[in-house]
From Swiss-Prot:
Record SUPFAM superfamilies: Ribosomal proteins L15p and L18e (SSF52080)
Protein's organism: Shewanella oneidensis (strain ATCC 700550 / JCM 31522 / CIP 106686 / LMG 19005 / NCIMB 14063 / MR-1)
Protein name, per record: Large ribosomal subunit protein uL15
GO biological process, one term: translation
Purpose: Binds to the 23S rRNA.
Pfam families: Ribosomal_L27A
NCBIfam families reported for this sequence: rplO_bact
Length: 144
């Protein structure tokens, strides 16, 4: 068996409806588009969010908040992911080398999710209260 020889079972897939191919098909002539109007034309239709000229909901509602640019380069690392890191010292570069976080990440925060068995030293990363307790319970320590 090869990937290029795989195919669905006979009768498992329906043929797509062929529109505009004669009156006997039931979808001839106007091809299910009705008569005239913008939506019947080639390329016809309106963009998503267009409300026919009425002031759109997006503009009627007030603006709020902002998008933090720091959040784009900050990652949350779960405690159980620390096991993927080789060595006892865990810092930003160690997380990148272990492919726990991507290369563009500049800040990381360790959150409590899962458990850790071996003692590790966390350097230069933010740590939540729960994660701190879990790391210290395993015999590890946190250095700022």
């Amino acid at each position: 068996m090869r990937l290029n020889t795989l195919s669905p079972a006979a009768g498992a897939k329906h043929a797509p409806k062929r529109v505009g191919r004669g009156m006997g098909s039931g979808l001839g002539k106007t091809a299910g588009r009705g008569h005239k109007g913008q939506k019947s034309r080639s390329g016809g239709g309106v963009r998503p969010g267009f409300e026919g000229g009425q002031m759109p909901l997006k503009i009627r509602l007030p603006k709020f908040g902002f998008t933090s640019r720091r959040a784009m380069v900050t990652a949350e690392v779960r405690v159980l992911e620390l096991a993927k890191v080789n060595g006892d010292v865990i810092d930003l570069n160690a997380l990148k080398d272990a492919n726990v976080i991507t290369r563009n990440i500049q800040f990381a925060k360790i959150v409590l999710s899962g458990t850790i068995e071996r003692p590790v030293t966390v350097k230069g990363l933010k740590v939540t209260k729960g994660a701190r307790a879990a790391i210290e319970a395993a015999g590890g320590k946190i250095e700022e």
